[in-house]
Regions:
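Generic protein-terminus/edge-of-domain signal
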Residues: 1-49, 60, 66-69, 80-83
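Glycine/small-residue-rich loop that forms an oxyanion/phosphate-binding "nest" at active or ligand-binding sites
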Residues: 75
Length: 84
């Protein structure tokens, strides 16, 4: 069971927008990107295609940047997503 803490749909940002959370966030974070972004995952900066999604566990480092205007959906949620 999990609880949605905050959510935004089709949220706009300016070109160059970045999130840099070296220690992550205290909640799960789900992101859906309408356009291409660069995501740091497993130590590598990777260009993700439009409509890519990523789910971060609490405390997982988060970094992404959009070189163009960005539109994205995001959800912060807490709880146990294991289903156990």
């Amino acid at each position: 069971m999990f609880k949605t803490e905050s959510i935004r749909h089709a949220w706009p940002e300016k070109a160059g927008f970045a999130i840099n959370r070296p220690k992550g966030h205290w909640q799960y974070t789900f992101l859906h990107f309408f356009n291409s972004v660069e995501i740091l995952a497993e130590g590598k900066l990777t260009k993700a295609p439009p409509h890519a999604c990523i789910l971060y566990r609490p405390g997982t480092p988060q970094y992404f940047i959009s070189r163009q205007p960005l539109t994205h959906d995001w959800i912060h949620f807490s709880g146990d997503i294991s289903g156990a």
